[in-house]
């Protein structure tokens, strides 16, 4: 019988092989790779055309707010999928029933209320 530590031995070996292989590849690329810096190589790449603005430029805070809202609603989708799968009974599983339905309704209502609040505050208004 294997001890709990022995059951994780193959995972540890796979992890060590992956880290070792990555380290060897990085070391070989660093040792064998050519070093010929030039002005063209140091310019930022902009879809094959010449850059029209500096690479280090401040972004508007609105981009970050939209990114945070995307993450919130993406996490909502992550929670909705397993809920939808487990809501109805199937294959001997009793299902979530009304308690699961009501709890997800409260969750979605909270997120919709947050979206309405954000909308009313004008966070999603890009006119200004």
From Swiss-Prot:
Instruction: Name its cellular compartments.
Output: Cell inner membrane
Q: Name one GO cellular component term.
A: NADH dehydrogenase complex
Q: Name one Pfam family in it.
A: Oxidored_q4
Top enzyme category? translocase
Tell me the InterPro entries matching this sequence. Answer: NAD(P)H_OxRDtase_bac/plastid, NADH_UbQ/plastoQ_OxRdtase_su3, NDAH_ubi_oxred_su3_sf
Q: How does it sit in the membrane?
A: Multi-pass membrane protein
Q: Which residues cross the membrane?
A: 9-29, 68-88, 96-116
EC number(s) per entry: 7.1.1.-
Keyword Zinc set for record: no
Write out the catalysed reaction.
a quinone + NADH + 5 H(+)(in) = a quinol + NAD(+) + 4 H(+)(out)
GO MF annotation list: NADH dehydrogenase (ubiquinone) activity; NADH:ubiquinone reductase (non-electrogenic) activity; quinone binding
- Record's subunit section: NDH-1 is composed of 14 different subunits. Subunits NuoA, H, J, K, L, M, N constitute the membrane sector of the complex.
The Swiss-Prot or TrEMBL record describes its family as follows: Belongs to the complex I subunit 3 family.
Relate the protein's function as given in its record.
NDH-1 shuttles electrons from NADH, via FMN and iron-sulfur (Fe-S) centers, to quinones in the respiratory chain. The immediate electron acceptor for the enzyme in this species is believed to be ubiquinone. Couples the redox reaction to proton translocation (for every two electrons transferred, four hydrogen ions are translocated across the cytoplasmic membrane), and thus conserves the redox energy in a proton gradient.
Q: What is this protein called?
A: NADH-quinone oxidoreductase subunit A
- Taxonomic source organism: Anaeromyxobacter sp. (strain Fw109-5)
């Amino acid at each position: 019988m294997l001890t709990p530590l022995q059951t994780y031995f193959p995972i540890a070996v796979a992890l060590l092989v992956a880290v070792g292989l990555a380290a060897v590849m990085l070391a070989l690329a660093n040792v064998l790779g050519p070093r010929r810096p030039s002005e063209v190589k140091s310019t930022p790449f902009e879809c094959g055309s010449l850059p029209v603005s500096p690479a280090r430029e401040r972004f508007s805070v609105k981009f970050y707010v939209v990114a945070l809202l995307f993450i919130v609603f993406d996490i909502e989708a992550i929670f909705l999928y397993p809920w939808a799968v487990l809501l109805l009974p199937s294959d001997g599983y009793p299902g979530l029933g009304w308690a699961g339905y009501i709890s997800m309704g409260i969750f979605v209502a909270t997120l919709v209320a947050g979206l309405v609040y954000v909308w009313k505050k004008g966070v999603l208004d890009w006119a200004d």
